[in-house]
Design a protein with these regions (language model features):
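PAPS-dependent sulfotransferase catalytic core
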Residues: 1-51, 87-92, 140-142, 147-195
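PAPS-dependent sulfotransferase catalytic domain
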Residues: 3, 22-25, 56-155
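Short, solvent-exposed loop/turn segments at secondary-structure junctions
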Residues: 8-13, 31-33, 50-53, 74-79, ...
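A residue-level signal for conserved active-site and pocket-lining positions in enzyme catalytic cores
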Residues: 11, 112, 191
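Hydrophobic alpha-helical segments typical of transmembrane helices
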Residues: 38-41, 112, 187
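Surface-exposed cleft-lining segments at the edges of enzyme active sites
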Residues: 48-50, 94-104, 132-133, 167-178
Length: 197
């Protein structure tokens, strides 16, 4: 089984649509059953973007059936802007949105990878950085991930550079809360230390 651990707004739909032909599964990309019910809805693939937050007991239960986990991160502020443009509530400030992402741990990549490295064999976790490994490098990324997932190929009917969902005319937004910025910086540094150390 292949399990996508995260994050949203990191090309998960694009990747899923490219590789789903390799699996005898015609269900939803994001069934959300691992987080909501503690169980799989199939034994092949789950690209729910909230899988990173599943209970530890669920992770331990399914791990024997998982061949690879995919963890894609992105510059946290860039991710937040894309997510904010898609999901913000009326009147919600960008700082408030960032606060909610930090509070729910969604952009706390250091804490997330630390937890997962303790839960499962870290060699099973494929880690990619959207900004460094995917953006502008679609061909090398798809070749690498297909090799690492032991897949026969990918859907070539749509050009690799075409995205399924793209946020156009993104505004320039900044988090002006020094405490939140410090937390984000600490998380990025922790992530780098854990994954590169």
């Amino acid at each position: 089984m292949i399990v996508y651990l995260g994050m949203p707004k990191c090309a998960s739909t694009w990747l899923y649509d490219k590789i789903k032909q390799n699996f005898d599964y015609d269900g939803k990309k994001e069934p959300h059953t691992l987080v909501e019910y503690g169980t799989t809805n199939n034994n092949l693939i789950d690209f729910s973007t909230n899988n990173w937050s599943m209970d530890s007991s669920t992770a331990l239960k399914i791990d024997k059936d998982v061949s690879k986990y995919i963890f894609i991160v992105r510059d946290p502020i860039e991710l937040a802007i894309s997510y904010y443009m898609q999901t913000r509530l009326d009147g919600e400030s960008f700082n408030d949105f960032i606060f909610s992402l930090v509070k729910t741990k969604l952009i706390c990549f250091g804490d997330i990878v630390e937890r997962w490295y303790k839960l499962v064999d870290k060699r099973k976790i494929l880690i990619y950085d959207y900004n460094k490994d995917i953006q502008g490098k679609h061909q090398s990324f798809i070749a690498d991930i297909c090799k690492n997932l032991d897949l026969d190929g990918y859907d070539q009917t749509v050009p690799l550079q075409d995205k399924i969902f793209s946020t156009h005319n993104k505004p320039e937004l900044k988090c002006t809360d020094a405490n939140l910025n410090a937390i984000i910086k600490t998380q990025v540094e922790k992530f780098k230390q854990i994954t590169q150390g």
